[in-house]
């Protein structure tokens, strides 16, 4: 591990008079090579934190850090996000969503190290009162929509397995599930239904967003079936910055605050984002320095609005790497929803007393949570969307009317096909985890309407 070699220069404990010139030269060469490979060409001659003589890569803000301090800086951000936001309790079992890219690879490494440290602390503890949280890994296989040869796909998936299995301890289980599995029924394989549903979406951006929704649904399904308490995503500041701009362009400004917080409990299994303060370039550089193997062979090319926004963010990054942080910090100033923190009774009892006041329950009067979420993407409804839903409930004659009314405006215009007949067929293809909820609502609505009609007087009834 290249970063480990930097410990010879002292890392965080090294002074300005480090004498390991040979090791420093080796680290300098490694850092320069890694920086060039990921496009980080800005180097300084010494670490701005420990003052060591090794070459330092420039991070956001212009401060140069040696390999050891650079790694400690990212790990510190990760730990701070996890602990200060109460993301993981000792009794939790956490499911890490692993894509094979640098962000999820670093998240896997860091949560693994945190668990190993917790196990060491538990072993030396006299009381051993608190258990150690568990970690599982999930990979959603989307190769059914990939045009690559099957042998290449299988080799990439095997690489995913080897990356996870290379961790000596700490991983509870490895779950590799096919995206089409959420469409499967007892009588039908899900591949045909997935392909047909995707083909019915005419908008490139809509197709990408639809697949993203299916990915979350798959992770939720894995977590529920295997007893996980949290889902940990590798979404970093760069990815969130792209989402902020793309969501704004798509007209999703009302629901945007829900997507940029550390914690999101609107889902049945809460979702946490411990890498929210880390840039993609920093995570890629750490993978290079630490020789962390990644696998991005199965990545699908982006199109539409998402691709344009990613290109725009890349241009901004070239001018000033801190622009991504600026975008994320600006979005964080928006008022979060009540589901953007854990508030269950007793949830924070294990926390140190100095942190507990931060997690006081959100007052019901201050809550902005509408309690109505989009059928597909899970976005909270705005006031206009709520009004449309209420209006539809009163005059809906068909189940399809309720289905479409429970979709946010973005999903309605970008994902749903045009035409009532097409919509009916499209909804018939969707996973039962989505449509089952609407069927329950529709049945309740029909029952209520029938009960009301029983008490209504007919036009020719004289009241006797």
Curated annotation (Swiss-Prot):
Gene Ontology CC terms: cytosol
Coiled coil segments of this chain: none
Annotated compartments: Cytoplasm
Molecular function (Gene Ontology), one example: sulfurtransferase activity
InterPro entries, per database record: CTU2, Rossmann-like_a/b/a_fold
Top-level taxon of the source organism: Eukaryota
Pathway: tRNA modification; 5-methoxycarbonylmethyl-2-thiouridine-tRNA biosynthesis
GO biological process entries: protein urmylation; tRNA wobble position uridine thiolation
Keyword Transmembrane helix found: no
Keywords: Cytoplasm, tRNA processing
UniProt function note: Plays a central role in 2-thiolation of mcm(5)S(2)U at tRNA wobble positions of tRNA(Lys), tRNA(Glu) and tRNA(Gln). May act by forming a heterodimer with NCS6/CTU1 that ligates sulfur from thiocarboxylated URM1 onto the uridine of tRNAs at wobble position.
Family, per entry: Belongs to the CTU2/NCS2 family.
UniProt name for this protein: Cytoplasmic tRNA 2-thiolation protein 2
Organism placement in taxonomy: Eukaryota, Viridiplantae, Streptophyta, Embryophyta, Tracheophyta
């Amino acid at each position: 591990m290249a970063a480990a070699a930097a410990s010879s220069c002292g890392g965080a404990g090294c002074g300005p008079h480090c004498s390991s010139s040979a090791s420093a030269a080796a680290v300098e060469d490694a850092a320069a090579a890694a920086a060039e490979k990921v496009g980080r060409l800005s180097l300084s001659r010494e670490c701005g934190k420990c003052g060591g003589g090794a070459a330092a890569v420039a991070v956001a803000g212009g401060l140069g850090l040696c390999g050891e301090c650079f790694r400690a800086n990212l790990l510190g951000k990760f730990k701070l996000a996890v602990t200060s936001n109460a993301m993981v309790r000792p009794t939790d079992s956490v499911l890490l969503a692993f894509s094979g890219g640098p962000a999820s690879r670093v998240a896997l490494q860091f949560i693994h190290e945190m668990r190993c440290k917790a196990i060491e602390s538990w072993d030396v503890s006299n009381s051993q009162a608190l258990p150690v949280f568990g970690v599982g890994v999930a990979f959603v296989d989307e190769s059914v929509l990939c045009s690559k040869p099957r042998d290449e796909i299988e080799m990439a998936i095997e690489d995913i397995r080897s990356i996870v299995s290379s961790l000596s301890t700490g991983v509870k289980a490895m779950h590799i599930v096919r995206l089409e599995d959420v469409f499967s029924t007892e009588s039908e394989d899900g591949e045909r239904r997935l392909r047909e549903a995707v083909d019915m979406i005419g908008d490139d951006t809509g197709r990408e967003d639809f697949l993203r929704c299916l990915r979350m649904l798959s992770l939720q399904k894995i977590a529920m079936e295997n007893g996980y308490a949290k889902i940990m995503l590798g979404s970093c500041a760069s990815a969130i910055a792209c989402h902020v701009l793309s969501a704004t362009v798509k007209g999703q400004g009302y629901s945007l605050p829900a997507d940029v917080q550390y914690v999101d409990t609107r889902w049945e299994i809460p979702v946490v984002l411990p890498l929210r303060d880390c840039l993609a370039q920093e995570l890629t550089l750490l993978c290079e320095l630490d020789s962390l193997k990644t696998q991005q062979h199965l990545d699908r090319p982006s199109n539409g609005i998402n691709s344009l926004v990613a290109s725009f963010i890349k241009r901004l990054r070239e001018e000033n790497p801190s622009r991504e942080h600026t975008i994320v910090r600006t979005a964080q100033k928006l008022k979060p929803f009540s589901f953007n923190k854990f508030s269950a009774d007793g949830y924070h009892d294990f926390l140190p007393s100095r942190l507990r006041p931060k997690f006081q329950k959100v007052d019901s009067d201050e809550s902005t949570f509408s309690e109505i979420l989009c059928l597909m993407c899970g976005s909270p409804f705005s006031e206009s969307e709520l009004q449309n839903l209420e209006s539809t409930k009163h005059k809906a004659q068909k189940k399809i009317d309720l289905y479409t009314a429970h979709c946010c405006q973005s999903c309605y215009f970008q994902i749903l096909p045009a035409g009532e007949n097409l919509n009916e067929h499209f909804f018939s293809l969707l996973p039962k985890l989505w449509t089952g909820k609407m069927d329950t609502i529709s049945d309740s609505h029909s029952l209520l309407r029938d009960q009301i009609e029983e008490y209504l007087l007919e036009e020719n009834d004289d009241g006797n």
